[in-house]
């Protein structure tokens, strides 16, 4: 027997058409779950997408599409790379929205005209029997032409043993239409429900149009992001300049970018200088000065000068494409709370059908005369007023808008689960270097011991550190280069994680590192002096201390404000660093972190253990970092937040990525999460409260007090407004501003 357990899982996201309610979502997920090779499937009603994790050696894209089609739905057009054909898909959705509005207005207009005749029979010179015959034709058109969507979808569901919202609408309108048809055919003068059936269809269609329009507004963030990408680029090849489609760019191409143009790819400037509007990344509208050697990001606007850049990441590898992809994935994901809602909505429609049947039977047996119209009114009102759509849209629409608003503010959320988790955070751990500080340290003092000069101290230290990528090492090498010091070769290089480096330089064994590393190696550090606020890098030659380099890293100007906002949000704020306690306390005092919340002299391999310690005390921990050595702690934390300017591995280990390096985005992300979850709770309270309150009203519980039964037409209006209210409430998140 062949085991597939070791095969890596693949993931595919497909746009699905034809879904109308939570029951549709549940049916597609069931069909996908039954397909051999599918590990997990999540279908999102708001984004109209199915995200599938599967074993590629057991099922491929065509098999997944076949499962969706077997459920009775279609997959939208795709390119060869699997990406949706955005323009064609959006045009198709625009056409569908226009058709919905047209049919809604026509059906409602016809229904209201028939209702006017029914309510004012004296206004027509014919007996009611003839009026019923005249109304049969327009009622039939509305029922089977404008209402074809509901009938076809309901029939499709019944073939698979599923009851959906379309089933409710179809049952309700067909019952009203069928009863009215019977009254007309037998020539009775009793009132009919042709008008109610037509108005119901018109109002439900109008609700669908409003819902589709609101969902389109919520999904506009991705379209807006992709519109930032230029369609052509000015490429320099073989000494000639030519405009090429953006899809033909290659990594390594030289590109000229003129004022007023958007940068076509990620890369670095090789010639010229300018100021770039990077508001799409940071939210800050002030242009950022760029010159040769500086990195530029595709989609940003060149505000002033002309420059030549070298493309490094093009097409789907650019930051802009990755942001759009992350937003799309987050919008398509399910928050844990949604899975509970799905379990309820899966049973909702069958329960509504039973309630409608019970109401019909009750009023038929015990209702006022004439009993059959009363029973029909109650049953149709129950079927029509029930709104599974509102429950199905309550969570995904809020996640969709919240993720999009986050992207606009430079906060990339990986999933709905991350948005839900962020509002539970009670403690935030901030890594020092690159998070609280700029991550660009510089040597501010050289303290050679007797018998060693500053030049010799710097030369030996820089030669040994040249093989290291640590920010402190780069600061030492940068100072040596700036002073024009020629560095001798280093051999036997060894990097000690969290400690320093060892190498052989000029035949001498050089150790450059922290005080702790030297103590572990038995070197005396009694003569070492370092000013407060400086990181001391000690240099040892052949076991003897020869001096110290004092290195300082500037605190980010917004760090203190970020810490203040975190405290204002009732969060514990901790600092984690491998630096000396004296340095950490000096920085903590500057930004507002108390000494008892500082974890200093922590090795990289100990960072995740410190996170565990806080979790063991009951804290829900968010870890914020940017370096490779932060990845284990980010993964261990309840919520990993990566500074986007940091290492790729840190970004991969995190649930939230900050595009820029502004630390104020951390409290903003938590505030956004709280606002999103508050909106979800409001939506769910409305959706469940609406159904729990109005379904009994539609069934007639107020009849003993009021003497009337709810009109099916009013029920249709209430149902249409219910789902629209949920989407509209979610759209309020577009106005979110961090405080």
Set out the residue ranges of the language-model regions.
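Membrane-embedded alpha-helical bundles of multi-pass transporters
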Residues: 123-134, 159, 178, 182, ...
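P-type ATPase nucleotide-binding
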Residues: 443-571, 581, 593-611
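Conserved cytosolic catalytic loops of P-type ATPases
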Residues: 37-58, 62, 224-317, 417-461, ...
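Conserved ATP-binding TGD loop and adjacent catalytic N/P-domain core of P-type ATPases
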Residues: 9, 26, 507, 535, ...
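Actuator/coupling domain of P-type ATPases
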Residues: 63-78, 82-88, 115, 126, ...
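Conserved catalytic phosphorylation-site environment of P-type ATPases
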Residues: 281, 340, 377, 387-464, ...
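Flexible metal-binding regulatory segments at protein termini and peripheral loops
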Residues: 1-131, 156, 224, 239-242, ...
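Bilayer-spanning, highly hydrophobic alpha-helical transmembrane segments
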Residues: 105-113, 339-367, 381-387, 396-397, ...
């Amino acid at each position: 027997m062949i085991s597939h357990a070791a095969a890596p899982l693949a993931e595919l996201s497909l746009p699905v058409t034809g879904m109308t309610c939570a029951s549709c979502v549940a049916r597609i997920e069931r069909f996908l779950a039954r397909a051999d090779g599918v590990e997990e499937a999540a279908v999102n009603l708001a984004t109209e997408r199915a995200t599938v994790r599967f074993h590629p050696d057991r099922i491929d894209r065509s098999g997944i599409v076949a499962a969706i089609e077997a459920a009775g739905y279609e997959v939208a057009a795709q390119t060869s790379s699997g990406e949706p054909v955005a323009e064609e898909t959006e045009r198709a959705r625009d056409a569908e929205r226009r058709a919905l509005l047209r049919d809604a207005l026509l059906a409602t207009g016809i229904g209201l005209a028939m209702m006017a005749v029914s309510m004012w029979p004296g206004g027509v010179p014919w007996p009611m029997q003839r009026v019923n015959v005249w109304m049969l034709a327009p009622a039939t058109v509305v029922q089977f032409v404008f209402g074809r969507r509901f009938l076809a979808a309901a029939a499709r569901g019944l073939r698979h043993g599923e009851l959906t919202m379309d089933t409710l609408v179809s049952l309700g309108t067909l019952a009203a239409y069928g009863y009215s048809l019977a009254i007309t055919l037998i020539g009775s003068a009793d009132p009919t429900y042709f008008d109610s059936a037509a108005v119901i269809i018109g109002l439900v269609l109008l609700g669908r149009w409003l819902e589709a329009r609101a969902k389109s507004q919520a999904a506009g963030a991705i379209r807006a992001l992709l519109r930032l990408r230029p369609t052509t680029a000015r490429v320099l090849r073989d000494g000639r300049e030519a405009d090429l489609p953006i899809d033909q760019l290659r990594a390594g191409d030289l590109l000229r970018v003129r004022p007023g143009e958007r940068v076509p790819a990620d890369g670095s400037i090789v010639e010229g200088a300018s100021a770039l509007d990077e508001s799409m990344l940071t939210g800050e509208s002030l242009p950022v000065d760029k010159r040769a050697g500086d990195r530029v990001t595709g989609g940003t606007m060149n505000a002033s000068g002309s420059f030549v850049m070298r493309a490094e990441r093009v097409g789907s590898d650019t930051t802009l494409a990755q942001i759009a992809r992350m937003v799309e994935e987050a919008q398509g994901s399910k928050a844990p709370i949604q899975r509970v809602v799905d379990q309820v909505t899966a049973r909702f429609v069958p329960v509504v059908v039973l309630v409608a049947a019970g109401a019909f039977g009750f009023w038929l047996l015990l209702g006022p005369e004439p009993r059959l119209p009363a029973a029909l009114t109650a049953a149709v009102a129950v079927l029509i007023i029930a709104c599974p759509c509102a429950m199905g849209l309550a969570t995904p629409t809020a996640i969709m808008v919240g993720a999009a608003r986050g992207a606009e503010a430079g906060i990339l959320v990986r999933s709905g689960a991350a948005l839900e988790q962020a509002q539970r955070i009670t403690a935030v751990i901030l890594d020092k270097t690159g998070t609280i500080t700029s991550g660009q340290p510089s040597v501010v003092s050289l303290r050679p011991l007797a018998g060693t000069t500053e030049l010799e101290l710097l030369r030996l230290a820089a030669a040994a550190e040249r093989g290291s990528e640590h920010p402190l090492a780069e600061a030492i090498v940068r100072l040596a280069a700036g002073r024009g010091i020629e560095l001798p070769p280093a051999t036997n290089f060894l990097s000690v994680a969290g400690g320093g480096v060892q190498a052989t330089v000029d035949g001498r064994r050089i150790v450059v590192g922290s005080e702790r590393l030297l103590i572990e190696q038995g070197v005396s550090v009694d003569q070492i002096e370092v000013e407060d606020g400086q990181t001391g890098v000690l240099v040892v030659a052949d076991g003897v201390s020869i001096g110290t380099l004092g290195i300082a890293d500037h605190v980010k100007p917004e760090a203190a404000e970020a810490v203040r906002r975190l405290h204002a949000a009732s969060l514990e704020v901790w600092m984690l660093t491998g630096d000396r306690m004296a340095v950490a306390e000096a920085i903590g005092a500057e930004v507002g972190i108390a000494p008892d919340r500082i974890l200093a002299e922590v090795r990289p391999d100990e960072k995740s253990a410190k996170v565990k310690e806080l979790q063991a005390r009951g804290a829900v921990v968010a870890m914020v970092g940017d370096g490779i050595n932060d990845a284990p702690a980010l993964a261990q934390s309840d919520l990993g937040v990566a500074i986007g300017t940091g290492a790729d591995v840190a970004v991969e280990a995190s649930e939230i990525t900050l595009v820029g390096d502004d630390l104020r985005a951390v409290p903003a992300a938590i505030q956004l999460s709280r606002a999103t979850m508050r909106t979800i709770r409001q939506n769910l309270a409305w959706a469940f409260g609406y159904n729990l309150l109005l379904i009994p009203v539609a069934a007639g519980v107020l009849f003993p007090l009021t003497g009337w039964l709810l009109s099916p037409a009013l029920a249709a209006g209430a149902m249409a407004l219910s789902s629209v209210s949920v989407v509209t409430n979610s759209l309020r998140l577009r106005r979110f501003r961090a405080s």
